[in-house]
UniProtKB/Swiss-Prot annotation:
InterPro entries in the record: TET_plant, Tetraspanin/Peripherin
Biological classification of the source: Eukaryota, Viridiplantae, Streptophyta, Embryophyta, Tracheophyta
Cell location: Membrane
Topology, Cytoplasmic side: 1-7, 66-74, 242-282
Transmembrane annotation, as ranges: 8-28, 45-65, 75-95, 221-241
BP-aspect Gene Ontology terms: auxin-activated signaling pathway; organ growth
Gene designation: TET6
Pfam families: Tetraspanin (PF00335)
Name used for this protein in its record: Tetraspanin-6
Primary localization: membrane
Family the UniProt entry places it in: Belongs to the tetraspanin (TM4SF) family.
Organism whose genome encodes this protein: Arabidopsis thaliana (Mouse-ear cress)
Amino acid sequence: MYRFSNTVIGVLNLLTLLASIPIIGTALYKARSSTTCENFLQTPLLVIGFIILIVSLAGFIGACFNVAWALWVYLVVMIFLIATLMGLTLFGLVVTSQGGGVEVPGRIYKEYRLGDYHPWLRERVRDPEYWNSIRSCILSSKTCTKIESWTTLDYFQRDMTSVQSGCCKPPTACTYEAGVVDGGGDCFRWNNGVEMLCYECDACKAGVLEEIRLDWRKLSVVNILVLVLLIAVYAAGCCAFHNTRHAAHPYHPSDDNRMTRVRPRWDYYWWRWWHEKKEQLY
């Protein structure tokens, strides 16, 4: 049992150690490829990836080399990691439960409304300093350049990303006739300038939040899978820690201060039975 549980914890920690590498790689990739340069998802992902890497390494060393203190540190950190990841996952599910696009009659793409999203997300994109950094990133990614050459027919037949729908065109309800603007606040914010467009529109902020919402939903699924794995590893770690201490102190005093003998392992009886049978045959 001692060797079995320590082997299991060693293998599981090796798997989580290897799994932390793509987690870190995914966070770095999304930080570079994200249209909005949104980093409040990538930062927790990076931190979690590095913590899993370090904790798994400590658990692997403790289980394979019978280092009791390494396993003790591993178990303490692991329980905090599980609690943190569980809290982050629940928070993500709550703040992404609201939102989604609105169908536009006669169009394939959807449009997005800022009021449909969770208040925590809305307050975040309304912060001027924070929004300016996202706006600069959208400009540098040339997201709107990709639809500059679209014809009127393209707007009826082709789909858009949430950022393109909110930031690169005025809302479909807007009308601009004879110098009169009608259709709501975003219609007045629209500007034909390449660096202006609808970047200050609420629809643009909503489009960014929709991209974040979808990314966070995917991250929550990954977090749940990682949580299941970490809980399994933690349970095996508790067994390995118990066995490591038992290996260091194989005999324990009883209440009357007498030493009790440890019973032979179950596989010893099978080995003796097989050895006797083999001697009878030969």
